[in-house]
Structures are given as C-alpha cells and as structure tokens.
Amino acid sequence: MERPPPRAAGRDPSALRAEAPWLRAEGPGPRAAPVTVPTPPQGSSVGGGFAGLEFARPQESEPRASDLGAPRTWTGAAAGPRTPSAHIPVPAQRATPGKARLDEVMAAAALTSLSTSPLLLGAPVAAFSPEPGLEPWKEALVRPPGSYSSSSNSGDWGWDLASDQSSPSTPSPPLPPEAAHFLFGEPTLRKRKSPAQVMFQCLWKSCGKVLSTASAMQRHIRLVHLGRQAEPEQSDGEEDFYYTELDVGVDTLTDGLSSLTPVSPTASMPPAFPRLELPELLEPPALPSPLRPPAPPLPPPPVLSTVANPQSCHSDRVYQGCLTPARLEPQPTEVGACPPALSSRIGVTLRKPRGDAKKCRKVYGMERRDLWCTACRWKKACQRFLD
C-alpha cells in the first residue's frame, strides 16, 4: 500500500504563512530567524506533512551595535546556544562618570588652599587603577589626603597638599591706619587739637587750687573746705560758688611753660610772654579803679603758676585785692610790677570765665548773701552789676 506524497512539497507558500503567522512578510520591526525548508527525500518520508520543515521562534531584539562596538550580525536558531563571556566590551573613548566629580573636588581643594600656586604642571603622580569597575573618584577617595592627581586626554597634572602645608606662607605685617583707610574705606579718626583747655580754679581764700574737671573741683570744695562727706546727689550745690573756670590756651602753655607739673614759686611767671610798654598805663592816676594792685603783692601758689594764664592770675588777684576794706594808693615801685600783667591782659584775648558774671558773690562774699540780688541767689546771671 503506497502512502500519499507529503503535502508540504506541493503546497502554496501563502497557505503556509496563513497557518504560521510568524512566517509572514516582515515589517519594519525586528526580523525573525530565517526559515529553512529542506527538500524532501526522494524516498519514502518518515514524518507527517510538516516533518521536513524546521521553524525558528521569533528572536528578541538584539542590543544595538553602537553599545557593543561590533559589526551588525544576526544569529539564527541553527547557530546554537550563546557561550557565556567574562569580558564585557567597553568603548575606549567613553567618558568616565566620575571625571566631572573629581574635577569639582580638585577645584574646591585648590580654592581653599592657602598656597600661591596649587597647580603643579609635570608628570602624572599616579595613574588610574587597572581594576575593572573602579572609578577615578573612588580611587581619589582611597588615596591619602593631599596626594590628589588626575590624568586626562589634554594633559596630566597633580597637586600635593602635604607639600603646601609643610611650607606655610609668611604672615604679612599689620597694615598702618592710613593703608587700612584706603583699603577698607573706614574713616580715620583725626586728632583735633583744641585751641583752649578749660580748667577750674578754687576761689576759697588762700587756696587757689586748679583742677581739670568740674566734678573733681566740687569734690575738693565739698571735702576740704565745706567739710561735708555727702555724695554729689545729696549736695545743695553750694560748692558751685567757690570755683571758677579758666581758659588756658594750648600754645600759651607750650611756649611759656616747660611742663604741666607743679614747679617752685620762683618760676611762677613765665618770661616768654611779650611785654607791651604803654606810657599812659605806667602813670598811677591813669590806672582804672578795678585794676589797682594790692599793697602787699602776694606770690601766686605753685599749682596755679603751672596751668593758669596771666590774665586769669591777674584778674583773680585783683579781685582779692578789691575785697580788702582799706583803699591803698598805688606806689611807683609797685606800678612797675603791673605792666607785664596789664600787657598780657591786653595782648591775650580769651573768652570771659564763667565766674566773672556773678558779681554779687564777688563783691559781697559768701558771708553777706542777704545783700545779693535775686538772680545771684538763684545762681543766675547777675542783674545788679552789669558789664
């Protein structure tokens, strides 16, 4: 009994594509493996209708050739199983992901360094590790600090932090105030010399002490003359009547006096002041009444001679002379001692001390306060003796 011939040999290929969808015409998608349809043997066939056909299952999309760096090849089902490979091909020109990070680390280290030139051009200090999978930034972290190095296509450079730390820079000297003013824009404080210095003189009889502050003078009067131990807050202000202000010129002190320390009474009047010779002032009848010199010329105290000017000395001594009840006619010999004081009073013009405005206190004294005007009692400008 003869078997029928195989149907596959004489069938239409379109019918085969209808029964096997994977054998249809391929579109733009991934291609399937080629189909091998061998010629049936001339003898009797052993299998069924599809015994002589070998069909391959659709292959998955292969990796792109750009990633593998190999020519475009396709493998069919007849090629056999793929052999495992221990080597993964990596393109040589591929940029390392840690290069940018290493550059940032090196830039930050160079900026924070105190060295003048942290970039040292020369041979590479160390190369990258040949181990696969070790990135350059990891290698930089493994190295000890201060031995960073990098190699790129453009050139090699390295930087040793330990060499920079071993030679610190020499500290610069401090800037003068003038240079700091120009660099930082800070206003420099100018030292202004005051044209006159205000001093305070005690008006207590035979005291004449001169101090630089009003609080010190008030404390002196309160403790020494008034015998009070009260604090300034509890005081009634009586010590204000026992001292006056003195205007002492800086130029006068520097020219006429050697220093501001107390000296002996022999150096009370400085010889450097100019002397003005006026004939009408040398005559005794022409002298005004408030400028009459006292009969016994009192030597000024040593403390007063160091800081007070001749004008203040003369005015205070004349005031003490006017308080004497007896009127003395000026003698020719005594008039000769007055021209230096008179010439100094005319030549040196300073502002009026504060104590000159309180006339009632100077005329009547502290013992006869009942004769004072109301303004003087309330420590105001005197209204009785106007200048």
From Swiss-Prot:
A zinc finger (C2H2-type) spans 200-225. InterPro entries: CR1/CR2-DNA-binding_regulator (IPR052253), Znf_C2H2_type (IPR013087). This is SLC2A4 regulator. One of its GO terms (biological process) is regulation of DNA-templated transcription. It is found in: Cytoplasm; Nucleus. SMART domains: c-clamp, ZnF_C2H2. GO terms for molecular function: DNA-binding transcription factor activity; RNA polymerase II cis-regulatory region sequence-specific DNA binding; zinc ion binding. A motif (Nuclear export signal) lies at residues 253-263. It comes from Homo sapiens (Human). The lineage of its organism: Eukaryota, Metazoa, Chordata, Craniata, Vertebrata. The gene is SLC2A4RG. Residues 27-36 have a biased composition (Low complexity). Its main location: cytoplasm. Interacts with MEF2A. Residues 285-303 have a biased composition (Pro residues). Transcription factor involved in SLC2A4 and HD gene transactivation. Binds to the consensus sequence 5'-GCCGGCG-3'.
